[in-house]
Amino acid sequence: MTDYIGNYKNRPRRVVFYGRVSTEHEEQLSALGNQMEWYTDLALRNPNWTVVAQYIDEGITGTQMKKRPSFMRMIEHAKEHRFDLIVTRELSRFARNTVDALNATRELKQYGVEVYFVNDGIWTMDGDGEVRLT
């Protein structure tokens, strides 16, 4: 994992975090708390980030994006240009299949919103970002 994002990625950003757990079991909810703490630590290591929101879907499967209320609200807020970067720990938290991931990131790109999948090392505005999603 890269702690501090360099080069053009280092410019000031309005950042949101997206986290999801698929069940409401105690261990999953604890994992969600760990995800949020991890995001906070990451933000502290990137001083040009201003965290404006966190979107969390609890106890919801990732198979259908339209059934994830926080995810859909995040997309609506992207349309309103409330932020310019979504940070999520890994691709599997964002989408369960390649088609959904590509469709969502392409839509977000139209609004000027990038997605950074930290553990996967994928930044969607990179030249190879879309290819690496597949």
Regions found by a protein language model. Give the residues of each.
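Short, structured surface patches at the beginning of a domain
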Residues: M1-T134
